[in-house]
């Protein structure tokens, strides 16, 4: 049997196993205790536990019969609101298994539905409200129409704090017989931006070929720019050594496969920590934003990043700042 993705293998199965979201858990526990609940809307960035919490709630409500009483749908995968309507109708027409008073429909990516489709969904929610509850999952609550929001208890899911992510990653690494270095945790957190699913996937990919996972292993797994490489590139460019800076850029692009957007994200992360004046940081941040915009419009990556290096060189000639040093591991 193929090995499970670690994200699925270590997905919490109960409220007690969820390491964050204390306020959300407290309110959902009250619903379980009462044996009843309204429709729910979970919103927040990817990887913040929305699907996990919905499945945990199903397990807590229904126990051994949670699969029979739960229907999972994805608004992006389904072929339109008519398919969703028919599947919900088929699911809701039978009584819940066990002593549950209602069945549960989990609809992921609800914010990807058009306004017309959401209006139709609202009517579906009303028609089957007697014996069915909906949990809608969305990245952006602003994309959900007000008539649906008004019919739901709304819960916000935030990116996991670094301390809790580190704790979870260490737990998984220990269980899998992997030595996880602190610099690897730092890089995983920065690259995942609080997305726990992405963080665990990065750890698994890095651990596939390394029993000791450090920042270099994570960078290789993610095809990401190491902080030391960004610092070196910045120092070469701002000191006016354009030839060496361009050589370093091409090495990272064509030998290590780093994409233009990844360069910009890495520069932005490191810029905050660089020991240079705030007005220079602001100027560089504006430059990064300009280059990032042109990349999103389809401009050539090498040309745009080379332009970035020349502009950094011009800033360096004007202000002559001291070079910055790589962060200590």
From Swiss-Prot:
Coiled-coil boundaries: none
SMART domains per UniProt: AAA
MF terms (GO), sorted A to Z: ATP binding; ATP hydrolysis activity; DNA binding; DNA clamp loader activity
Key words, A-Z: ATP-binding, DNA replication, Nucleotide-binding
Record-listed ATP binding positions: 44-51
InterPro entries attached to this UniProt entry: AAA+_ATPase (IPR003593), ATPase_AAA_core (IPR003959), DNA_pol3_clamp-load_cplx_C (IPR008921), DNA_Rep/Repair_Clamp_Loader (IPR050238), P-loop_NTPase (IPR027417), Rep_factor-C_ssu_arc (IPR023748), Rep_factorC_C (IPR013748), RFC_lid (IPR047854)
Matches recorded under CDD domains: AAA (cd00009), HLD_clamp_RFC (cd18140)
Pfam family of the protein (one): AAA
Any one GO BP annotation for this protein: DNA repair
Keyword Membrane: no
One GO location term (cellular component): DNA replication factor C complex
Subunit structure: Heteromultimer composed of small subunits (RfcS) and large subunits (RfcL).
Family the UniProt entry places it in: Belongs to the activator 1 small subunits family. RfcS subfamily.
Role summary: Part of the RFC clamp loader complex which loads the PCNA sliding clamp onto DNA.
This protein's name: Replication factor C small subunit 1
Source organism of the structure: Pyrobaculum aerophilum (strain ATCC 51768 / DSM 7523 / JCM 9630 / CIP 104966 / NBRC 100827 / IM2)
High-level lineage: Archaea, Thermoproteota, Thermoprotei, Thermoproteales, Thermoproteaceae
């Amino acid at each position: 049997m193929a090995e499970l993705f670690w994200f699925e293998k270590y997905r919490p199965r109960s409220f007690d196993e969820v390491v964050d979201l204390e306020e959300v858990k407290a309110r959902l526990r009250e619903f379980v205790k009462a044996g009843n609940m309204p429709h729910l809307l979970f919103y927040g960035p990817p990887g913040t536990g929305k699907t996990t919490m919905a499945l945990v709630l199903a397990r807590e409500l229904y126990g051994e019969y949670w699969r029979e009483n739960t229907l999972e749908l994805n608004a992006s995968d389904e072929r339109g609101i008519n398919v969703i309507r028919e599947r919900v109708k088929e699911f809701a027409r039978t009584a819940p298994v066990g002593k549950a008073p209602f069945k549960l429909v989990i609809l992921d990516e609800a914010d990807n539905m058009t306004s017309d489709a959401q209006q139709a969904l609202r009517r579906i929610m009303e028609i089957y409200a007697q014996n069915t509850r909906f949990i809608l999952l969305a990245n952006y609550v602003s994309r959900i129409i007000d008539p649906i929001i008004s019919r739901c208890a709304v819960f916000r899911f935030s990116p996991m704090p670094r301390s809790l992510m580190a704790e979870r990653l260490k737990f998984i690494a220990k269980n899998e017989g992997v030595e996880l270095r602190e610099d690897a945790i730092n890089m995983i957190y920065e690259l995942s931006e609080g997305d726990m699913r992405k963080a665990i996937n990065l750890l698994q990919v890095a651990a596939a070929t390394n029993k000791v996972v450090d920042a270099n292993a994570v960078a290789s797994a993610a095809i990401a720019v190491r902080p030391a490489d960004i610092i070196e590139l910045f120092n070469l460019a701002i000191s006016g050594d354009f030839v060496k800076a361009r050589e370093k850029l091409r090495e990272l692009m064509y030998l290590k496969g780093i994409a233009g957007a990844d360069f910009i994200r890495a520069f932005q992360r490191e810029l905050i920590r660089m020991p240079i004046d705030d007005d220079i940081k602001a100027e560089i941040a504006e430059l990064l934003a300009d280059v990032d915009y042109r990349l999103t419009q389809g401009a050539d990556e090498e040309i745009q990043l080379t332009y970035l290096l020349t502009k950094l060189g011009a800033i360096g000639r004007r202000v002559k700042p001291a070079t910055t040093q790589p962060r200590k591991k």
